[in-house]
Amino acid sequence: MHRVIVIGGANVDIEGRSSGAFIGGTSNPGDVTLSAGGVGRNIAENLARLGVATELVTVLGNDPNGLILRDACAKAGVGLTHAITAKHATGTYLVVLSKKGELISAINDMSAIESLKPQQLESLADELTQA
């Protein structure tokens, strides 16, 4: 059986949602959630849930968020055999939403996946052509 190799981002999503009218320039009460995200990781997880053997080639930091993503991939059945451990922090997306779920602001730190160079993928050429 063939497998799919996904090359893409994996990051931790931090979402803050105001429980009332958002007031700028101050702390607002609300709920904060943390979840595994990233377009590449999301695609890989959904393929694995469909029963497709899936490997994710991504860049993770050697930090707590990297551990969260490694655990989430393991639980979803997504292989990380070729994941690269970077000096950068694991990708993080921080979003602040209004009570209605409208975007107020967001910040992303994708320096880990942005550090991926084509030369780092050359060693996977044979596997990529067989996937």
What does each model-found stretch correspond to?
Residues 85, 95-131:
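Conserved phosphate-binding/catalytic loop of the ribokinase/pfkB sugar-kinase fold
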Residues 2-3, 79-81, 127:
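Secondary-structure boundary/capping motif
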